[in-house]
């Protein structure tokens, strides 16, 4: 029997009785956000909306984005990254489990000095991929051009936020590069590794 999304009691200020809300809504009220799936337009838009709402509600309290993601679509991921840079509160990024592909890009986008990985977390970077099956030659050429632009954008962000030279990041993005939490810290993707 699946348990679904757990519900927890929550009492709004000024109310006598607590109401039961799903755990994620309760945690959102504490400014704790979760990316626990592949990045797509739906989850990206939900997180963007939450970040903007919470920023408007109080732009002095930091946001905390917990990441356990296998990656996903580039454009929704870049939109989420851009929002993290746009909102006034600092966005802490915390990798638990894995932050692969677009997940690692969002992880590196946290406020510098406020990016953390749990001790057994895994991080993976690589170049963006396209879907070339059943594409006409003209469309293929356009898609390759767009992919090259996206790759350059992602590479420059990694360079800026990790402090690694362009040639190192470019070379590493040629293939899947997996890292432990301490290796991700040495690379500059995270600033701290949580202690066990």
Curated annotation (Swiss-Prot):
CDD domains: S14_ClpP_2 (cd07017). One of its GO terms (biological process) is proteolysis. Disulfide bonds: none annotated. Its main location: plastid. One of its GO terms (cellular component) is chloroplast stroma. This is ATP-dependent Clp protease proteolytic subunit. It comes from Lactuca sativa. Belongs to the peptidase S14 family. It comes from the Eukaryota. Its EC number is 3.4.21.92. One of its GO terms (molecular function) is serine-type endopeptidase activity. Keywords: Chloroplast, Hydrolase, Plastid, Protease, Serine protease. Cleaves peptides in various proteins in a process that requires ATP hydrolysis. Has a chymotrypsin-like activity. Plays a major role in the degradation of misfolded proteins. Component of the chloroplastic Clp protease core complex. InterPro entries: ClpP (IPR001907), ClpP/crotonase-like_dom_sf (IPR029045), ClpP/TepA (IPR023562), ClpP_His_AS (IPR033135), ClpP_Ser_AS (IPR018215). It is an enzyme of class 3 (hydrolase). The active site is at 101 (nucleophile), 126. It is found in: Plastid, Chloroplast stroma.
């Amino acid at each position: 029997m699946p348990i679904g999304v757990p519900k927890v009691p929550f009492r709004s200020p000024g109310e006598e009785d607590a109401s039961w809300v799903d755990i994620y809504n309760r945690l959102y009220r504490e400014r704790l956000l979760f990316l626990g799936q592949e990045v797509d337009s739906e989850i990206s838009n939900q997180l963007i909306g939450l970040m903007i709402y919470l920023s408007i509600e109080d732009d002095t309290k930091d946001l905390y984005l917990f990441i356990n993601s296998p990656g996903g679509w580039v454009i929704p991921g870049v939109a989420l990254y851009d929002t993290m840079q746009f909102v006034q509160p600092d966005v802490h990024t915390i990798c638990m489990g894995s932050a692969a592909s677009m997940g690692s890009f969002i992880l590196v986008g946290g406020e510098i000095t406020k990016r953390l990985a749990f001790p057994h977390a895994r991080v993976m970077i690589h170049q963006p991929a396209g879907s070339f099956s059943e594409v006409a030659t003209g469309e293929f050429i356009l898609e390759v051009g767009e992919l090259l632009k996206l790759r350059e954008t992602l590479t420059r962000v990694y360079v800026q936020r990790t402090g690694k030279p362009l040639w190192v990041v470019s070379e590493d993005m040629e293939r899947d590069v997996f890292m432990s939490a301490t290796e991700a810290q040495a690379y500059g993707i995270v600033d701290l590794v949580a202690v066990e």
